[in-house]
Amino acid sequence: MKKIHIKKPDIKGAIDKLKNLKKEDVIRHFKARKERRARIIEARRNSAFARKMQPVYKFMNRFSLVFHALLACIINFAIEAISRHSLVEAWIYMTGSPLVFLYNAFMIFVTFSIVYLFKRRVFVRIIISVFWMILGIANGYMLLKRVTPFNAQDLKIASDGLSLINKYLDGFEIILFIVGIVAVVVWMISMWRRGGQYDGKIHHVRALIGIVVCAVLYVFVSNQAVDKRVVSTYFGNIAFAYEDYGLPYCFMASVFNTGIDEPSGYSKKTMEEIGQNGKLTESKITNAKTKKTKPNILFVQLESYFDVDNAEFFKTSQDVCPNLHKMFKKYSTGYFKVPSVGAGTANTEFEVLTGMNLRYFGPGEYPYKTMLKDHTCESAATALGKLGYGTHALHNNGGNFYSRARVFNNIGFDSFTSKEFMNILQLTENGWAKDAVLVQHIMDAMNSTKENDFVFTVSLQGHGDYPTEKVIQNPRITVSGIDDEALKNKWEYYVNQVYEMDQFAGNLIKAVEKRKEPTVVVFYGDHLPTMGLKAEDLKSRYLYNTNYVIWDNLGLKKQDRNIPSYQIMSEVFERLGIHSGTLFNYHQTRRKTKNYLSDLELLQYDILYGKQYVYNGKKPITEGHMKMGIRNVTLKNVVPHLDEGYSLYGENFTKSSKVFVNDEKQDSTFLNNTRIDLDETELKNGDKISIVQMGSSDTVFRKSDEYIYKDGKLTVQKGTGTDTTKSWVPQADGDK
């Protein structure tokens, strides 16, 4: 067997060469390199393959526009097939909506117009094609993991990097992802080096004029497509929109069409007229009884809830929501018009809490993510806070979901109790937290303040995706009238979750009644479940309707009416004689007047994107002050194990409680709300121990005071934890 001899590098010789290197040597090197490159290119041009491809390149250059049109159609079909996970579905889309298909193909065609600026036209075509195919592959993969398509918001959180990859890819898929990226990069480099070049003269001015013409033509075609309702600028459900209007249009709309464009007629004078010269920003209570008692106001958003009695294609073995039906008969109720179908929980929240109409924002936009995550805005919390209410938000899901922890801080809440501050023992068969846990936390929030409270609760139990397999072996409620077994299983799972959500609603009312405090409780559904419902399946014949009811112990008159989500808060305020919050006052005074909606658009623009003329320099909120959680996490003692490790005993631990020793996170095991074990940590005298309530992406929501460990005992260092009198956000960002 031959031995492999590795030549020892001549480092000393290389250093000597560098020392003696002259300018002429460098010039000679690059000149030789250029000549060598020219010879290689010439050889490739004269190669057998190049000679065979010359007629192809010549044909492609002569009929390049036709070629681009065909290529755009092929790419469009390919990305739709990948997105829909079916060639058949892509064909049905193409033949069923030919104008939509051609519009999206035209968008891709326009992007190919830039190739005329380059000699390496084949390579530029490849780059553009790869870009569109990556979008299609990303969307198709995302839809295997979730119901929301790939959109601009995913790009905005791409900085999360590893956490995002770990969320959607397992180990094998990460390897495939890396191999795929490397393969594409290698192929593109190869095509850059070996691809043919355009031999003619590049007319940059003509090319730029052509690009401008294509862009102008695209704008014209887009306006016509919207006017003729080929596509829409409003997405009630972003997943359905991608199916109806295609990936290219919907993705680009999510990138470029966000926020509210400045409406015509926007000016200081106009806003002074709409603001009624300052009256809209006033805060007052005109009802004497309300002024005296200040009733608690509770809003409960029920995930994917609607009254299943409104579905006409199946029946249930018993009443699915007896408690809510009882309330429907006695208290004000009706259909609740929401901005989305099958998804978009945060957008219903947004309309309810701010009084803003989502229709004026970009298609498929989530203002929580695009605006309120980083900017303050008045809301029901600020409106009631001005009147002396304590304001609290609760949700039995992660605090970072939809950026709620930052959003609620920016819209004026005093506290937010998320999943990280709850001991959730009951989960659905799909792994979502059940809503029963919320009752005690709502009571805790109300008990945390001396004054009466506004509590906004977002439930979770009804969340999809709904299993096609029979996962509840002995369901309390069964479904009949559905022949498809998979669909029947989905509805049977759903109605049993709704039944338990109804039990939660009933138990909450019982808990409120025990307090014997004047209270109003509003229950409503955020959107219909993701079940592929059609308008003809429902009694209301409308997919944007859920249900609401306003329970009270004040003796309010029953007044049934259908109401959109952006008006519900002002409706409740008006019945109580509360006039606070610019948009809520606007709805109360202008709801049935001329130009109500057009002036609402102006008002929303002025508040979020304009010069805030309506506030006249007195903005309702300039910074947040919200704390995360209600209860303090405390340590009482530490007990060493017989072999190694320790048990920490204290109060209010949850699964999100992480132990830090000297500011370093430890491996720990949560056992219950009073005990956490440290199996591998060795404590020394003087060590500082703290408990952090940690969210996703290692977000520090709240930190306990530090405890000094000495001789088996703990001494608290008061004032070393999160300052709950100030906003949690800058403190967490400082820790990061």
Please place each PLM-identified region on the residue numbering.
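Solvent-exposed soluble domains appended to multi-pass membrane proteins
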Residues: 282-290, 302, 307-736
